[in-house]
Amino acid sequence: MKEAYLYIVEKSVAWEFDSPEYGRLARKVVELLYERKEDLSDDRVAIFLNISTAETRRILQYLMKQNMVGVKKRTTEDYRIEYTWYVDDEIIRQAIKNRAKVAKEKISSLIRSLTEGAYYICPTCHMRYTLDEAINYGGVCPVCGTQLEYVENTEEINKLTKVYEEVDKI
């Protein structure tokens, strides 16, 4: 389960910041938080990993918004607000559960759209068109001019249903 969580963190951050390097950095941040089993400030995380505090904060705040790390807020003796970050098994479980829920919703939506209408595909450029779009284009692909072909959706629907059932087990 931990590997799946680390993969989700890495890919999510890499996608958000359009940087595979940031994804790998986020993976290191959450690995550190999980292995140390203690609440750490962003400054301490930055020191442990030898990276800038700004990068650390940016990654941690994104992960917090995605519910992939836990955060605790406390006021210091000199009335400053200090945030500490942590990752535990419950955070990992919830992150995977939330990601599975989003995936199920997308798959369900795709299955619904495939069952509700007929689709045509261009055999050359593989663009997919609804029945209405195919009629509007006269049965010809507007991108490359090739004749559109009807797609039998049952095989795709069956595959997506199996994937949905697998995700539902999580």
UniProtKB/Swiss-Prot annotation:
The keyword DNA-binding applies. InterPro entries: TF_E_archaea (IPR016481), TFIIE/TFIIEa_HTH (IPR017919), TFIIE_asu (IPR002853), TFIIEa/SarR/Rpc3_HTH_dom (IPR024550), WH-like_DNA-bd_sf (IPR036388), WH_DNA-bd_sf (IPR036390). SMART domains: TFIIE. The keyword Mitochondrion does not apply. One of its GO terms (biological process) is regulation of DNA-templated transcription. Residues 1-93 form the HTH TFE/IIEalpha-type domain. Transmembrane segments: none annotated. It comes from the Archaea. GO terms for molecular function: DNA binding. Disulfide bonds: none annotated. Pfam families: TFIIE_alpha. Belongs to the TFE family. Transcription factor that plays a role in the activation of archaeal genes transcribed by RNA polymerase. Facilitates transcription initiation by enhancing TATA-box recognition by TATA-box-binding protein (Tbp), and transcription factor B (Tfb) and RNA polymerase recruitment. Not absolutely required for transcription in vitro, but particularly important in cases where Tbp or Tfb function is not optimal. It dynamically alters the nucleic acid-binding properties of RNA polymerases by stabilizing the initiation complex and destabilizing elongation complexes. This is Transcription factor E. It comes from Pyrobaculum islandicum (strain DSM 4184 / JCM 9189 / GEO3).
